[in-house]
C-alpha cells in the first residue's frame, strides 16, 4: 500500500530523471518538512539509512488496543445525554404538532378597482357556455355530489352551473390555458397560474381555476436558499409547473404573463432566442410529495408552439419521449460509479447488487474516503476499484489538475500501445554523478495532503532502489522529465485511474455533517454551512457540478431535514435544481427492507434531464416503528398510503439475523473461523450466499477468497471491570444495570440506591454499579449495560461497542455484539471482510449505508438507467422475486403505485 506520509528530509530525495541535487546546506531542515528538498548522496548505489525515529513509508500507524476503555469518556457521556434529551424533546414536539396537509395556494380578497384602469369593470364571462354534456365530460367533478370518501386534507369542490371558454377582467380578455398573475396576500409576490377552468358556481359567483406555477423560493428550496446561496444561482425567470390547483373568484386575476416551455435538452442558441421573447419559462414540474423536480411528460406540459424545441426528431425515442444520444444508446447495460465518502463500501456495494438484478452492470470504478482502514476494506472487497485515501476537497482539486494534464499530454489520435517507445530523454547508460538519481517511473498522483503544500504530487520510483524508497515529489520538481509524466498521464488516461467530466455515470455518497450532530455543542443554527464540519455537503455538490454524472444519489441522516428548519437538506436540493438536475427526496427505513433495525435515512436522487428520474422502492417488510420524520417533510417518507393494505413480510428480528452464529468469548482473536452450524432462517441463508450467487461481479464472476468461512466474528474486548459487570447482568429480556445488586427503581421510573443493600464492589475495588449509570439521563435511562433480546430490533447500528450508555450486549453471552453481528444488522453479506483494528471495524460498519436499502435503490436505478421505469409516480413495488433467496430478479419488473399522502492511494 502506498505511504500515508512523505519521506522525511533525512532520506535522500530525487526529483528528476537526471537532475543535480541541491547543496547539503539546503537540506538541513526539520525532519517533518515535505520532501521537496534534496540532500547530497555519497554514492548513487549506496542505500540510504533511516534514522531510528523516522517512520518508513510502508509502515502503518500502530494498531489501537482493541479493548473497551477502563472508564467511559465523561464528556462523551454528557454529550450523549444531551443529544438523547434533545432528541426526545424534538420527537415530543413532533407528536404534539398537527400533521400538515397538502400545501395549498390562497389568494387575498379580490379588489374591484384596479390601479391604472379606466373605471370599474365587473368581471364577466364572454360568449356562450359550453354545452352541458361537453362540460360534464370535461369537468365531471363539478357536476357530481361530493364523495363521502373525500380525504380530510382535500378541499371541497365548488359545484358548477355551467362552464365558459373565456372571460373579461378589467377590459382584458382571458382564455383557457392563458398564464396569469393572481393576486396574493398582502406583502407577498403575486401567484402565477395557468387557467384551466372558467365556471359559474351554483352560488352564482364567477370562478376560475388555476394550475399553479412555483418560483424556486415557493418550493421546498425556500427563500432562505435564494438569499444565502453562494454557489449556483437560480434563474429568476425560471418557474416550475405543478399539479396543484385552486378555485378563486374571477376578480383575483391581475394580468397576463408570457410563460414558455423550454425543453431541458434544447440547444443553447435556440434557448436564448425563446428566452428573449418571454417573461418566464419552465422546464420542469414540481410536486410537494417527495420534493420532486422532474421532467414534464409530453402529454402534461404545454401545447402547440409552446412545446416546440430545436431538437432533431431523429434524436428522440418516440416510444419513451426522451432524448437518447448515441453514446447513451451504446452504453445501456453498463455504467460506472464513483463512491464519495465511501467508507468500507456499503452504499456502492448495495447499488451494484441491486442494479445487477435489474440487468444493469454497474461497476464501482472509483472510491474516495479519508479513513485508511475503510479504504483497505473496500479495496479488498472490490479489487478492480481505484480507491483513494484522501480528503474529498483534495480529490476535487486533483481531478481539475488531472484534467489539465490530460489536455497537455493526451492527444485524440494517440497510439497507447507505442506511447513513449520512440522517445528517449537521454542515455541511461551515461554514468551518474554522486548527487544524481534516475526516475524509473511515476507510480501515483495526488494533490497535497499529509502536511504538504497544495499542488500536484507524483509518487516516484527511483532506478536502483526498492519500493520502500518511493517518494512523493511536487510536479514542479519533475519538469525536467516530461516523458515520464507523459507516459504516466497517457497510461492513466487509458486506464481511467481518475475520472474526467463525462466519465462518471453515477455518483453516490454520504457527506458527513458533523456540525449538526447532537454531540456538537457549538452548532451554528443560523448559517450551518459556515460551520467547517458541514462543508463536505458543499464539496460533494462541487464534485457533482464538475463531473456532471448522469445520476446522483446522496445519503444522509434525518437531522439534515430537522436542524435549522432543514437547511442542509434544502441546500442539497437547491444545488441540484440550480444545476438543472431533476431531483427527488425521500426518507427510507432500513427495517422496511428486511433488517432488524429501524435506521431512517434521507436519500436524494438527482438525474440529468436526458435521463429517467428513479423512483423509491416501497417497503418489502413490516417494521417495528421507532421515532419519526420532521413534519415539514412528512410527505417524503417512503411508505404505503394508510388506505393501502399491502402484503408485506414479517418484521425481521435479532434472532432471525444472528441466531446461527457460534458462541464466542469476550476476547476472540481469530478473524476467520468456521460457522459450526447451518443457517436457521431465510435471512441467514441469504446473507451466507457467495459473491457469485449474489451477482457480485467484484471478482469477475468468481467467489473470491475465504469462501464458506465466517469472517470478523469478533467482539470488542471488555475491560476486566466491565466484563465482571456484564457477567452479572441476567440473561433475560430487558435486563440492564437496574438488575444489579443495590439498585432499585423509585418514583417516575428513576433509579436510586437501595438503602437496605450495601454497595457491592468488583475484584478491582471499583463499584459494581458505576455512578455514571445511575445518573445517565437523570436516572431514567435503561441503556447502561443493556441486553438485547432475540425478539427485538435495534434502533440503529452505531459506531461504538462500549456498553456504558447503550444496549448492545448479546442476548445470552457475556459480551457485546461482534463486528459480524453488527454487519449482519446492516445487511452486509458474510463474505464482506473488514480491515483494521476491531474498533475501526465497528466504525466502518456503523457508518455504512444499510446494504439492503442500497440494493433496493440500485434496482430502481437500474430500471431508470435502462428507461424501463414507467410513469410519473415517485414510488414503485419491488417484484416478489427481489427478496427470495437464490432467485435472480433480473427478468422481473416492478410496478408503479400512486403517490401516498486500482490501488489504494494514500496521502
UniProtKB/Swiss-Prot annotation:
Keyword Iron tagged: no
Positions of the catalytic residues: 513
Keywords: DNA-binding, Methyltransferase, Nucleus, S-adenosyl-L-methionine, Transferase
Pfam families for this protein: BAH (PF01426), Chromo (PF00385), DNA_methylase (PF00145)
Biased composition (Low complexity): 1-15
GO molecular function: chromatin binding; DNA (cytosine-5-)-methyltransferase activity; DNA (cytosine-5-)-methyltransferase activity, acting on CpNpG substrates; DNA binding
Main location: nucleus
The name this protein goes by in its record: DNA (cytosine-5)-methyltransferase CMT3
Amino acid at each position: 500500500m502506498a505511504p500515508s506520509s512523505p519521506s522525511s528530509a533525512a532520506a535522500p530525495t530525487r526529483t528528476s530523471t537526471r537532475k543535480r541535487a541541491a547543496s547539503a546546506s539546503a537540506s538541513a531542515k526539520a525532519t517533518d518538512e515535505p520532501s521537496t528538498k534534496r540532500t547530497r548522496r555519497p554514492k548513487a548505489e549506496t542505500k540510504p539509512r533511516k534514522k531510528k525515529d523516522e517512520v518508513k513509508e510502508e509502515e502503518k500507524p500502530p494498531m489501537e488496543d482493541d479493548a473497551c476503555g477502563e472508564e467511559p469518556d465523561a464528556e462523551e457521556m454528557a454529550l450523549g445525554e444531551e443529544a438523547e434529551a434533545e432528541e426526545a424533546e424534538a420527537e415530543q414536539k413532533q407528536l404534539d404538532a398537527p400533521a400538515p396537509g397538502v400545501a395549498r395556494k390562497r389568494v387575498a380578497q379580490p379588489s374591484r378597482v384596479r390601479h391604472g384602469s379606466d373605471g370599474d369593470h365587473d368581471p364577466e364571462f364572454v360568449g356562450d357556455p359550453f354545452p352541458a354534456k361537453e362540460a360534464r365530460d370535461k369537468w365531471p367533478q363539478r357536476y357530481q355530489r361530493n364523495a363521502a370518501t373525500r380525504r380530510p386534507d382535500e378541499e371541497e369542490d365548488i359545484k358548477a352551473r355551467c362552464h365558459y371558454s373565456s372571460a373579461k377582467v378589467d377590459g382584458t380578455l382571458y382564455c383557457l390555458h392563458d398564464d396569469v398573475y393572481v393576486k396574493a396576500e398582502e406583502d407577498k409576490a403575486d401567484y402565477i397560474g395557468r387557467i384551466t377552468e372558467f365556471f359559474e358556481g351554483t352560488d352564482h359567483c364567477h370562478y376560475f381555476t388555476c394550475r399553479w406555477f412555483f418560483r424556486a423560493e415557493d418550493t421546498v428550496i425556500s427563500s432562505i436558499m435564494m438569499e444565502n446561496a453562494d454557489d449556483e444561482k437560480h434563474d429568476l425567470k425560471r418557474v416550475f409547473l405543478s399539479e396543484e390547483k385552486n378555485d378563486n373568484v374571477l376578480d383575483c386575476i391581475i394580468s397576463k404573463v408570457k410563460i414558455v416551455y423550454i425543453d431541458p435538452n434544447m440547444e443553447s442558441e435556440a434557448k436564448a432566442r425563446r428566452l428573449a421573447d418571454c417573461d418566464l419559462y419552465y422546464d420542469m414540474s414540481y410536486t410537494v410529495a417527495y420534493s420532486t423536480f422532474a421532467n414534464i411528460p409530453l402529454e402534461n406540459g404545454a401545447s402547440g408552439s409552446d412545446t416546440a424545441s430545436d431538437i432533431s426528431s431523429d434524436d428522440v425515442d418516440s416510444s419513451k419521449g426522451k432524448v437518447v444520444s448515441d453514446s447513451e444508446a451504446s452504453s445501456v447495460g453498463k455504467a460506472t460509479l464513483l463512491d464519495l465518502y465511501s467508507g468500507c463500501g456499503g452504499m456502492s456495494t448495495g447499488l451494484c447488487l441491486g442494479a445487477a438484478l435489474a440487468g444493469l452492470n454497474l461497476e464501482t470504478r472509483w472510491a474516495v474516503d479519508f479513513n485508511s482502514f475503510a479504504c483497505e476494506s473496500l479495496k479488498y472487497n472490490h479489487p478492480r476499484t481505484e480507491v483513494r485515501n484522501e480528503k474529498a476537497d483534495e480529490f476535487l482539486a486533483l481531478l481539475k489538475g488531472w484534467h489539465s494534464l490530460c489536455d497537455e499530454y493526451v492527444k485524440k489520435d494517440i497510439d497507447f500501445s507505442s506511447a513513449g517507445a520512440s522517445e528517449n530523454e537521454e542515455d541511461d547508460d551515461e554514468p551518474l554523478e554522486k548527487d544524481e538519481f534516475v526516475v524509473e517511473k511515476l507510480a501515483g498522483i495526488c494533490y497535497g495532503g499529509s502536511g504538504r503544500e497544495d499542488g500536484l504530487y507524483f509518487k516516484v520510483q527511483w532506478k536502483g532502489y526498492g519500493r520502500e524508497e518511493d517518494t512523493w515529489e511536487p510536479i514542479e520538481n519533475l519538469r525536467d522529465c516530461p516523458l515520464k509524466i507523459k507516459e504516466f498521464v497517457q497510461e492513466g488516461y487509458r486506464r481511467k485511474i481518475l475520472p474526467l467530466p463525462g466519465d462518471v455515470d453515477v455518483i453516490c455518497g454520504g457527506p458527513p455533517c458533523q456540525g449538526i450532530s447532537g454531540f456538537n455543542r457549538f452548532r451554528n443554527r443560523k448559517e450551518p454551512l459556515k460551520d467547517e464540519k458541514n462543508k463536505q455537503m458543499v464539496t460533494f455538490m462541487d464534485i457533482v457540478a464538475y463531473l456532471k454524472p448522469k445520476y446522483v444519489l446522496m445519503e444522509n441522516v434525518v437531522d439534515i431535514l430537522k436542524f435549522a428548519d432543514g437547511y442542509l437538506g434544502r441546500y442539497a436540493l437547491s444545488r441540484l435544481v440550480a444545476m438543472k438536475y431533476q431531483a427527488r427526496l425521500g426518507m427510507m427505513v432500513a427495517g422496511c427492507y428486511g433488517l432488524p433495525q429501524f435506521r431512517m435515512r434521507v436519500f436524494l436522487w438527482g438525474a440529468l434531464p436526458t435521463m429517467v428520474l428513479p423512483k423509491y422502492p416501497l417497503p418489502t417488510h413490516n417494521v417495528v416503528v421507532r421515532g419519526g420524520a420532521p413534519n415539514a417533510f412528512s410527505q417524503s417518507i417512503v411508505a404505503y398510503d394508510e388506505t393501502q393494505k399491502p402484503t408485506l413480510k414479517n418484521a425481521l428480528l435479532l434472532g432471525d439475523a444472528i441466531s446461527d452464529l457460534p458462541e464466542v468469548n469476550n476476547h476472540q482473536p481469530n478473524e476467520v473461523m468456521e460457522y459450526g452450524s447451518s443457517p436457521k432462517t431465510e435471512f441467514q441463508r441469504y446473507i451466507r450466499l457467495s459473491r457469485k450467487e449474489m451477482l457480485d461481479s467484484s471478482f469477475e464472476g468468481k467467489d473470491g477468497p475465504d469462501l464458506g468461512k465466517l469472517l470478523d466474528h469478533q467482539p470488542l474486548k471488555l475491560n476486566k471491570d466491565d466484563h465482571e459487570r456484564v457477567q452479572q447482568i441476567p440473561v433475560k429480556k430487558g435486563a440492564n444495570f437496574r438488575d444489579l445488586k443495590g439498585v432499585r427503581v423509585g418514583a417516575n421510573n428513576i433509579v436510586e440506591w437501595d438503602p437496605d443493600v450495601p454497595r457491592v464492589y468488583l475484584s478491582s475495588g471499583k463499584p459494581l454499579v458505576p455512578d455514571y449509570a445511575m445518573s445517565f439521563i437523570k436516572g431514567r435511562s435503561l441503556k447502561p449495560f443493556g441486553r438485547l433480546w432475540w425478539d427485538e430490533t435495534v434502533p440503529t447500528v452505531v459506531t461504538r461497542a462500549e456498553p456504558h450508555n447503550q444496549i448492545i450486549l448479546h442476548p445470552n453471552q457475556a459480551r457485546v455484539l461482534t463486528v459480524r453481528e453488527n454487519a449482519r444488522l446492516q445487511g452486509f453479506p458474510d463474505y464482506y471482510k473488514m480491515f483494521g483494528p476491531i474498533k475501526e471495524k465497528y466504525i466502518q460498519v456503523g457508518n455504512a449505508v444499510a446494504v439492503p436499502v442500497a440494493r433496493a435503490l440500485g434496482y430502481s436505478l437500474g430500471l431508470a438507467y435502462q428507461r424501463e421505469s414507467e410513469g410519473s409516480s415517485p414510488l414503485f413495488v419491488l417484484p416478489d422475486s427481489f427478496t427470495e433467496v437464490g432467485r435472480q430478479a433480473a427478468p422481473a419488473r416492478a410496478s408503479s403505485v400512486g403517490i401516498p399522502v486500482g490501488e489504494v492511494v494514500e496521502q
